[in-house]
């Protein structure tokens, strides 16, 4: 029986994901149920590097970065499920597929993105996930994602 874990802060996330600033896009894990689901957040600030050029007079978080953040949350779920608290040094989880991506609202400075990712299945090292991002309870983005665990 799976159990819902406590919060994982940025230090714990950095033990799992190889990403670093400016490409680490998950700030905190609120809930994680190994093998099933994760709920995490990204606090979007005006200081984000991508807002310099997207767009100066009307800053909007690029949709591809919302998708990347969802993939990072899926990666944390996969790592926590299969590797434990720390990613194994000889393995990485690669983002390998996306289907049914839809963007429903703009994400702007001051928003808090809430990621909800469900692990649908894992077969031969490839995981399939249903992912959604919300702002203030309103759906901002949804997609079906795949990631693959590979030895390096």
UniProtKB/Swiss-Prot annotation:
What GO MF terms are annotated?
(3R)-hydroxyacyl-[acyl-carrier-protein] dehydratase activity
Active-site residues, record numbering mapped to chain = 54
Q: Where in the cell is it found?
A: Cytoplasm
Q: What is its main location?
A: cytoplasm
EC number of the protein: 4.2.1.59
Task: Give the stretches traversing the membrane.
Answer: none
Catalysed reaction(s) here are:
a (3R)-hydroxyacyl-[ACP] = a (2E)-enoyl-[ACP] + H2O
Tell me the domain of life.
Bacteria
Q: Name one GO cellular component term.
A: cytoplasm
Keywords per UniProt: Cytoplasm, Lipid A biosynthesis, Lipid biosynthesis, Lipid metabolism, Lyase
Q: Which GO terms describe its biological process?
A: fatty acid biosynthetic process; lipid A biosynthetic process
A Pfam family the protein falls into = FabA
Q: What does this protein do?
A: Involved in unsaturated fatty acids biosynthesis. Catalyzes the dehydration of short chain beta-hydroxyacyl-ACPs and long chain saturated and unsaturated beta-hydroxyacyl-ACPs.
Q: Which family does it belong to?
A: Belongs to the thioester dehydratase family. FabZ subfamily.
User: Can you say what this protein is called?
Assistant: 3-hydroxyacyl-[acyl-carrier-protein] dehydratase FabZ
Gene this chain is encoded by: fabZ
């Amino acid at each position: 029986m799976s159990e819902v874990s406590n919060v994982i802060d940025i230090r714990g996330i950095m033990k799992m994901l190889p990403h670093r600033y400016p490409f680490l896009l998950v700030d905190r894990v609120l809930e994680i149920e190994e093998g099933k689901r994760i709920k995490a957040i990204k606090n979007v600030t005006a200081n984000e590097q991508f807002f310099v050029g997207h767009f100066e007079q009307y800053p909007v978080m690029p949709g591809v970065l919302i998708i990347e953040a969802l993939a990072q949350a899926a990666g944390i779920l996969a790592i926590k499920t299969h590797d434990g608290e720390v990613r194994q040094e000889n393995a990485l989880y690669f983002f390998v597929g996306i289907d049914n991506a839809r963007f429903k609202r703009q994400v702007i400075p001051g928003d808090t993105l809430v990621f909800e990712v469900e692990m649908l299945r894992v077969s031969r090292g490839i995981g399939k996930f249903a992912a959604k991002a919300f702002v203030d309870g309103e759906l901002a983005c949804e997609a079906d994602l795949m990631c693959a665990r590979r030895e390096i």
